[in-house]
């Protein structure tokens, strides 16, 4: 039984997505009361909260998954405080759950077993910027927008851009991605080094303290072990990231198509032609309609590609020429251009607002995002089949995706008080995930496993790989205190 269905067993009239909680830690008499005093000796009175509103805020993210709040929320201001607090938790066997901005979509911050939430928002400094080396080190409270604002006058930027203004260390923890991944890669290839506090309070530097080479062959890749670990192996307290030069020119375009097939075929052909496109995003007719209504736009309500080209003026001419020829051959419209920064900003804001635009289609309902990713050659087939599945089962699920790397989302909007609809959505998400696995893809391209995809992870990687992961977890966190119940 998947967590999605287990959640129904703990349903309420308002929100059936409630996961059960086994309070095997904090139920021990007096444990929380004793540790709060110890926490305050480290972080001060203002750095510790047991207030119900604060705990509720830090016990949920943007997902449909709902758990009980943590017992305590701490607000460390330095890695030394994180380490000291972790040692207290380790001694009392209290679970630790890291919290960045709460924008995750897989229930990664839920306190399944109670414990202590480490809210890292006060650690918000950009520590070391090396302009000549194109890298920067940040604390976990720095968000992607905050970093790019800091970099505004340097000629550099950090391009990984998930829809929300997520914290950069949270993005590393989930191996996040975004609209620029087709050109600049995901978090996994843009993290050079991490500082991590382990379950017992030990501080680990995954590539060696202060090291930031662009490449290394020195031993096991511990940095990539922690990227995507979702807080289950340790708390990330610093990240050293690659930066990129801001391109000489950027231009965006919108192109409409007569069918889903023709739009996705164009995507595959553009990539196969070797066009170094910076962004290529697909929105189906339902999603375009939602974006139009939410952002007061007037794009044609048909399957659509949002595209962006980066480079020199001369280089972009060739990119645009090839792309226009391909889209025209597939029945695409003439490009509607967005050349100045303000117009491009409105276009990409509409794409980044897709989650909220989808929610606005059915006020009062909840949203759930799928996250499959397949090899790009299988993309036309899976999107067409998925669209047919949505229509056949009367599910509101506008599609948007980073189709340049084979990743797309169905932003499913549903009434959680309607058991028939919940069951139809559950069955659909299971079919979609297994359709992706059958096409040599993955159940999650960028959101992570969290609470809801643990069974699918086992299907995807197999029992032996799960055993290896469990062995790594047991070595680094033998008491299972780091974000228990997630991933594995």
Regions found by a protein language model. Name each.
Residues 49-58, 241-245, 254-259, 264-431, ...:
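C-terminal substrate-recognition/cap domain of FAD-linked oxidoreductases
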Residues 89, 231, 410, 477:
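Conserved, mostly hydrophobic/aromatic
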Residues 125-281, 482:
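FAD-binding subdomain of flavoenzyme oxidoreductases
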Residues 44-45, 437-449, 474, 478-482:
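Alpha-helix capping/hinge segments and adjacent helical runs
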Residues 2-87, 104-134, 287-295, 341-369, ...:
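N-terminal flexible segment immediately upstream of the FAD-binding catalytic core
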Residues 202, 454-488:
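Activity-critical C-terminal alpha-helical subdomain
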């Amino acid at each position: 039984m998947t967590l999605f269905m287990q959640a129904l067993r703990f349903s309420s009239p308002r929100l059936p997505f409630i996961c059960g909680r086994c309070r095997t830690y904090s139920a021990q008499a007096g444990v929380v009361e004793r540790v709060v005093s110890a926490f305050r000796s480290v972080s001060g009175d203002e750095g510790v909260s047991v207030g119900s509103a604060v705990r509720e805020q830090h016990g949920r993210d943007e997902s449909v998954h709902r758990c009980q709040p943590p017992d305590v929320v701490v607000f460390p201001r330095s890695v030394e405080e994180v380490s000291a607090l972790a040692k207290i938790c380790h001694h009392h066997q209290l679970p630790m759950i890291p919290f960045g901005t709460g924008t995750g979509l897989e229930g990664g911050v839920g306190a399944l077993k109670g414990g202590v939430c480490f809210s890292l928002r006060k650690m918000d400094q950009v520590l070391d910027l090396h302009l000549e080396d194109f890298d920067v080190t940040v604390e976990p409270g720095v968000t992607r927008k905050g970093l790019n604002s800091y970099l505004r006058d340097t000629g550099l930027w950090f391009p990984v851009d998930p829809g929300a203004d997520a914290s950069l260390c949270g993005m590393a923890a989930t191996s996040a991605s975004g609209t620029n991944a087709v050109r600049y890669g995901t978090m996994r290839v843009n993290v050079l080094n991490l500082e991590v506090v382990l379950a017992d309070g030990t501080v680990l530097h995954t590539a060696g303290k202060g090291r930031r080479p662009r490449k290394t062959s020195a031993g096991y890749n511990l940095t990539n072990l922690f990227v995507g670990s979702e807080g289950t192996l340790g708390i990330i307290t610093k990240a050293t990231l690659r930066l990129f030069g801001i391109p000489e020119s950027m231009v965006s375009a919108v192109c409409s198509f007569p069918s889903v097939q023709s739009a996705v075929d164009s995507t595959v052909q553009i990539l196969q032609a070797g066009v170094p496109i910076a962004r290529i995003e697909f929105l189906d007719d339902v999603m375009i309609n939602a974006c139009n209504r939410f952002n007061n736009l007037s794009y044609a309500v048909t399957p659509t590609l949002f595209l962006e080209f980066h480079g020199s003026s001369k280089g972009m001419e060739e990119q645009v020429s090839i792309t226009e020829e391909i889209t025209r051959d597939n029945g695409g419209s003439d490009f509607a251009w967005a050349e100045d920064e303000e117009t491009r900003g409105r276009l990409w804001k509409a794409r980044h607002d897709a989650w909220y635009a989808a929610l606005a289609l059915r006020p009062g309902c909840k949203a759930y995002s799928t996250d499959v990713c397949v090899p790009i050659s299988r993309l036309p087939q899976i999107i067409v089949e998925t669209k047919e599945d949505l229509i056949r089962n009367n599910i509101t699920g506008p599609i948007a995706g980073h189709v340049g790397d084979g990743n797309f989302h169905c932003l499913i909007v549903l009434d959680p008080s309607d058991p028939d609809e919940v069951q139809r959505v559950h069955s659909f998400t299971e079919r979609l995930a297994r359709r992706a696995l059958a096409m040599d893809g993955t159940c999650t391209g960028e959101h992570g496993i969290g609470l809801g995809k643990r069974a699918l992870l086992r299907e995807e990687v197999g029992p032996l790989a799960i055993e290896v992961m469990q062995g790594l977890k047991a070595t680094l966190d033998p008491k299972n205190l780091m974000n228990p119940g997630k991933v594995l």
